[in-house]
Amino acid sequence: MSALKRMMRVSNRSLIAFIFFFSLSTSCLYFIYVAPGIANTYLFMVQARGIMLRENVKTIGHMIRLYTNKNTTLNGTDYPEGNNTSDYLVQTTTYLPQNFTYLPHLPCPEKLPYMRGFLSVNVSEISFDEVHQLFSKDSEIGPGGHWRPKDCKPRWKVAVLIPFRNRHEHLPIFFLHLIPMLQKQRLEFAFYVIEQTGTQPFNRAMLFNVGFKEAMKDRAWDCVIFHDVDHLPENDRNYYGCGEMPRHFAAKLDKYMYILPYKEFFGGVSGLTVEQFRKINGFPNAFWGWGGEDDDLWNRVHYAGYNVTRPEGDLGKYISIPHHHRGEVQFLGRYKLLRYSKERQYIDGLNNLLYTPKILVDRLYTNISVNLMPELAPIEDY
């Protein structure tokens, strides 16, 4: 009888433990599904701690070797003890002097004296009326936020595309920060906010494709920046022009502890020339909900023969504006789509997109509202 009671106690404990762990695991899965942004932030924070610990151990070992050796060799050159041969130093770049004279018929330099480096980022909420009032004093800003330097020829004509839904408090902060920085960089630019209406899950990639098509109808741009509304650069030397290869600008984000989450990470802020974006057939349209579209874009870029470049050192640092919105639901089908990125590249993108936009031109941006649905991007079997 006593043995039976002991067995029942053990069974009850096992049942309680099973219920506890089952409840915990299902709660975690539900949290990851309904709040992927928060869940991934926590995950990246844990990963970043491990990376930082390994880097610190590596640095300490490097310093011990320098101290214990009388001479150390770097790239075949002997350096006496005490010289700094750190792998982490970044060579400083020379920027033009304050008295540099621009010529209206010559291209604007990429390294201007106004570009001082570190930017003070203010993420305090501000109304659109206040921001409009501030920029109303600048008569050179045209409708849609269009601006062009007059003292030199802009090296790039940049369309900044911003996918949008229910982040109205972020937009004025974004413009207050970005407009002065792009003016310092002597780029021609304008902003396009592509707003998703309706009840379908958020489709960031499809919004970018819509924005690209509408921006090309508006002006003859040659560089396109794909920019999340809650990402603010911390360094004005992070030049928003394009290049021979696609560019990932937001290499170090504060919510990821300024560490690149993984090598193929291509999210937040990226830039491609118009030619590059057309060659890869744009973003995929099939990613509904959170996650996967940036990884697919990375694949498209590499399948087209390009490499991705990033800013050196701390130039690619960004601050993420805090928000109180519920995150978009996870797109659980993204892994299957990513397995077939190559097969889908030229049947899902700019070439299969249908939409009917509503366009409103504001003083600082062009608003493109569109109700997205899966049938607006029909895809053939692959």
From Swiss-Prot:
List of residues binding UDP-alpha-D-galactose: P163, F164, R165, N166, R167, F202, N203, R204, V229, D230, Y258, W290, H323, H324
Gene Ontology MF terms: galactosyltransferase activity; metal ion binding; UDP-galactose:glucosylceramide beta-1,4-galactosyltransferase activity
Function description: Catalyzes the synthesis of lactosylceramide (LacCer) via the transfer of galactose from UDP-galactose to glucosylceramide (GlcCer). LacCer is the starting point in the biosynthesis of all gangliosides (membrane-bound glycosphingolipids) which play pivotal roles in the CNS including neuronal maturation and axonal and myelin formation.
Topology within the bilayer: Single-pass type II membrane protein
Annotated N-acetyl-D-glucosamine binding sites: G292, E293, D294, D295, R334
Origin species: Mus musculus (Mouse)
UniProt-listed GO biological process terms: carbohydrate metabolic process; central nervous system myelination; central nervous system neuron axonogenesis; ganglioside biosynthetic process via lactosylceramide; lactosylceramide biosynthetic process; neuron maturation; protein glycosylation; sphingolipid biosynthetic process
Cell compartments where the protein resides: Golgi apparatus, Golgi stack membrane
Cofactor(s) required, per the database record: Mn(2+); Mg(2+); Ca(2+)
Enzyme class, first EC level, given as a word: transferase
Pathway linked to the protein: Protein modification; protein glycosylation; Sphingolipid metabolism
Protein known as: Beta-1,4-galactosyltransferase 6
Lineage: Eukaryota, Metazoa, Chordata, Craniata, Vertebrata
